[in-house]
């Protein structure tokens, strides 16, 4: 199929600062145990889908979302560190598991001020749990706006 050879553009899920996984204070992400990727230090409360695809994972705690693209690439957006312990408090989800989403669709609103007081960090990793054999290229570091192209999977 033609879409298997296309590059996948990955959008910033929110306003913030793009950082490397080396700057995330969690060994699972820093050591890339779940896959390669990058993180965003968020500055806006609304988080949007970084790619189009099927929402294969929507945690009931609303802190993490897994999206599978039509080409089979799987991306995990994990909002903050140890946020699973909040049991959804401070998170309002707008999507359900198995829903199709388009890049830029709003997934969740997070009360970042409240959440930041209760967890080690609000840095939010975007991980390629299945990169489909492609190579990740981060094309924009530092300050970004939601919807900016920040990475390309080639």
From Swiss-Prot:
Domain PTS EIIA type-1: residue ranges: 26-130
InterPro entries assigned to the protein according to its UniProt record, in alphabetical order: Dup_hybrid_motif, PTS_EIIA_1_perm, PTS_EIIA_component
Protein location: Cytoplasm
Gene Ontology MF annotations: kinase activity; metal ion binding
Coiled coil: none
Site (Important for phospho-donor activity) location in chain: 63
Keywords annotated in UniProt: Cytoplasm, Kinase, Metal-binding, Phosphoprotein, Phosphotransferase system, Sugar transport, Transferase, Transport, Zinc
Binding site for Zn(2+): 63, 78
A GO CC annotation given for this chain: cytoplasm
Residues recorded with modification Phosphohistidine: 78
KW Electron transport (keyword) present: no
Location of the active site: 78
Cofactor(s) demanded: Zn(2+)
One record GO biological process: phosphoenolpyruvate-dependent sugar phosphotransferase system
Pfam families: PTS_EIIA_1
Cofactor note: Binds 1 zinc ion per glycerol kinase EIIA-Glc dimer. The zinc ion is important for dimerization.
Quaternary data: Heterodimer with glycerol kinase (glpk).
Function of the molecule: The phosphoenolpyruvate-dependent sugar phosphotransferase system (sugar PTS), a major carbohydrate active transport system, catalyzes the phosphorylation of incoming sugar substrates concomitantly with their translocation across the cell membrane. The enzyme II complex composed of PtsG and Crr is involved in glucose transport.
Free-text note on domains in this protein's UniProt record: The EIIA domain is phosphorylated by phospho-HPr on a histidyl residue. Then, it transfers the phosphoryl group to the EIIB domain.
Protein's UniProt name: PTS system glucose-specific EIIA component
Taxonomic source organism: Mycoplasma capricolum subsp. capricolum (strain California kid / ATCC 27343 / NCTC 10154)
Gene: crr
